[in-house]
Amino acid sequence: MNGIKVGVLPWGQNVDWPTLRAVGQRADELGYDSLWTWDHLYPIQGDWQRPIFEGYLILAGWAAVTSRATLGLMVGANTFRNPALTAKLVTTLDHMSDGRAILGIGGAWFEREHRAYGIEFGSGFGERLDWLDEAVDLMAQMLRDGQGTARGRFYHATNVRNDPPPVQRRLPILIGGDGEKKTLHTVAKYADAWNTGGDVDFVRHKDEVLRRWCDEVGRDQAEIERTLGMGTVIIRDKESDARSYYAEIQRQHPGFSDQPKIGTAEQLADRLRPYVELGFRHIFFDASAPFDDETLERFVTEVKPRLEAVRAA
């Protein structure tokens, strides 16, 4: 858990499958530690009335053409699937990938896709986080004990079996989110990894809250891997070249306006230094079609070694 790991999250929107498959292969060949994708039914960047692929099937497709990187949703929408089914899905992915699956899960937030697909969205985020807590409890039982029982307010199951078990002795559960009253409590109880993002002060505060929850539930906080999402990254030696590529992203994703992290490999490593010093050792960034091979290659060959040096200092 102590080494630096880097990952990439290729968007499943506004892209064809051969291109999406190829970027997964390329990342794996370059030595990325993890491959992620979204779990959304409508695009979340730019115009929502555009094409997007389903998350678990993207991961299954990558499992067939990769051999190294772990595979997970960043993060799965708990509302989309019965939690017992989610445990079965990620277990199947673990077998398809020879033990490389991660169960990424969160409370879900994009109301438009829920309404369109007729998926229950609850009365608010607080209720969905209550659902998440019950769901992760059941999923953890199934993944770790081979069967699970749920007698909560929202989910009901009696000795539901998960057979075959995962390939991994402990298939990791990653929970994304920052809520101090509910999400981080759930992370402390069940998660093997936690995902967050934001400026250093924000992340430091959330990490402190998580540590307090770990103390309260009797959990060693060091057991929980910290992961950091950077959003879109463009590595170039000249800012004008980076801006030119950003314009290509905007053309392919109309309405996309988020500001990417732009800089040289050294500048990006310097930007990440305080997070590594804080204990975040698994860092990933978003990648959108048209996929940027220069950034993909330089992040793993130039940024990662610099972060390893920070960790070792």
What are these regions (language model features)?
Residues M1-A313:
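Active-site-adjacent structural elements that line small-molecule/cofactor binding pockets in enzymes
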